[in-house]
Amino acid sequence: MEEKLKQLEQEALEQVEAASSLKVVNDIRVQYLGKKGPITEVLRGMGKLSAEERPKMGALANEVRERIANAIADKNEKLEEEEMKQKLAGQTIDVTLPGNPVAVGGRHPLTVVIEEIEDLFIGMGYTVEEGPEVETDYYNFESLNLPKEHPARDMQDSFYITEETLMRTQTSPVQTRTMEKHEGKGPVKIICPGKVYRRDNDDATHSHQFMQIEGLVVDKNISMSDLKGTLELVAKKMFGQDREIRLRPSFFPFTEPSVEVDVTCFKCGGNGCSVCKGTGWIEILGAGMVHPNVLKMAGFDPKEYQGFAFGMGVERIAMLKYGIDDIRHFYTNDVRFISQFKQA
């Protein structure tokens, strides 16, 4: 039995050494070390040996098995290394070649416009305030001089969640909340950007959800001339230094007096074209002096403090600035549309 084990070892080691592929090595492993292999058969015949020979033959069989297994492992490692070298030699990489370009996204045009407006007002000493999109009826209407049953509420059909809770129809509630934090002491100088919601039918110029930026200044001795000067500066910064503005009388429950603000058409320079519908002017926002009732409900004495407020639709500003003819383009996630603003 001892000679048979040594003979099996010699045959196995010679075959392993001569093996030229991983498959051949695996076949040798199965042939000699498998459950039906000769070494296993030898171990099964140990019972026929005497009690004295059994330990000696058992130890020898295990040594032979271990040497064959080690030889197979070494051969596998060597063949795997050679196989990898051949694979790398056939797949040479030229590291001097330029890499594949990485697709780079662009900021959304609404983000570009919002950041531009925020930077403009921050440079004028304003701070940016935000508030909840799900608002109470009090802050969305009553605190803005729109009591229950007020006819002006029909101007903004709303998405109500409960009887006293709704999706805000404007960012004006942020102004009231901020004034309350000041506890009747000025100055207050803020802008408040954010989403607003109204029950409009979606079309080229209307959306049930859109972005709005409102501004508020409250301090002593604030006048209409302060509002006009601010809006003139904004128009020139946003649409060009040669722009002029005009104020038209209007009505908003939370301001008195109230105005609509137009800017000279940036396409025709005020001469009249299709963009301005031949008028030479384009409406950009609404504004006015803060109504005394709004100041009073927010904790300010209207005899001591005055203020002005303004609000603009971000989509409208972006449409005018970039010549976009349909508000729905902003929300369709069409990469062909958004990619045009990569450089913006």
From Swiss-Prot:
Disulfide bridge positions per record: none
BP term (GO), one: phenylalanyl-tRNA aminoacylation
Catalytic reaction equation(s): tRNA(Phe) + L-phenylalanine + ATP = L-phenylalanyl-tRNA(Phe) + AMP + diphosphate + H(+)
Family annotation (InterPro entries): aa-tRNA-synth_II, aa-tRNA-synth_II/BPL/LPL, Phe-tRNA-synth_IIc_asu, Phe-tRNA_ligase_II_N, Phe_tRNA_ligase_alpha1_bac, Phenylalanyl-tRNA_Synthase, tRNA-bd_arm
Binding site for Mg(2+): 256
Taxonomic superkingdom: Bacteria
Stored CDD domains: PheRS_alpha_core
A single GO cellular-component term on record: cytoplasm
Top-level enzyme category: ligase
The protein's required cofactors: Mg(2+)
Listed NCBIfam families: pheS
Protein name: Phenylalanine--tRNA ligase alpha subunit
Species for this entry: Bacillus subtilis (strain 168)
